Amino acid sequence: MKRIAIFTDGTWNSPGKGSPTNVLHLARGIKPVFEDVEQVAFYDWGVGADRKTLMGGISGVGIDKNIMDCYRFIVHNFNVGDQLFLFGFSRGAYTARSLGGFIRNCGILRREHAGQIPAAYQMYRKRSKSASPNAPGSVGFRRRYAWENITPIEFVGAWDTVGSLGIPVPFWGTLGEKEFLFHDTEPSKIIRHARHAVAIDEVREDFQPTLWDKKPDIDLQQVWFSGVHNNVGGSYDDRGLSDHALRWMVDEAHSLGLGFEKHALDTIKPDHRGKLYNSRRGIYMARSKHQRTIRGAIHESVKRRWQDDVDGYQSRCKPLRALLTSVGNDWDRIEIAGTGTSR
């Protein structure tokens, strides 16, 4: 048995860019062996990170390739009994969640049938009743080419999922919507544990979060953190806020067996007083604001930031103010998620 960890980054993110995202930080910190179990990692650059940056970032045309690249790595490395851990930020989170849907639909192909990956993906893309996971065609495809049983995914960790949209073109709206509606991003029964860190303070209408709905048979936690999109997923120079979301995700994955290098853990330094950046700049100024609505637990660092009124947070954070108003300013009626300790 080994652990296979897949890391998919956000739009225009790549290893050579400034401060690393949380996805890249984790990918660099995976131990090759932890508790006598081999661990292998695959990092996939964000949509639009290659030479086709503009169109890839605007329309998400690279998302098909990202999903298939991640899936191909799994096919080439997987053996029965291996555990799968999937991580992603922004559109990379959308990619990771779509990858989970792809595996649910087509299984994991045996290595000798890796040439069938394009056919498997086309079947997944149909998103029709005839190509659903339980349809005769899908079942027959898996029996012919995939490992015998649909493999459970041990863990999916997402930071502020947005769909294939995300990047607006002024006066044209947002490109790429219809092309990517086929993706199955809902947590399916093959996912055992799912974690989603969501940004409270993001106001760009093109970055509305793709939230998960609770399902009784899945261990799902969706926790809200202070900050805008990249304050939660990382890449800003001031990592105080993003390190809260990173530390939480590390603790959750570690509790399920994933091991990290000491150097990666030692550099995580959460700070609830960290800088809250302004993401509504440039072309986004021409677009409307969209206040997010908090649904679910908030991280304990949010409460501390509010109580300390860091940089006037009590007047600036409208979603949290609305939540507090709805419960009569009674913190005991709000679910608070905390942190643990990682090795």
Task: Name each model feature, range by range.
Residues 1-343:
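Active-site- or binding-pocket-proximal scaffold segments within functional domains
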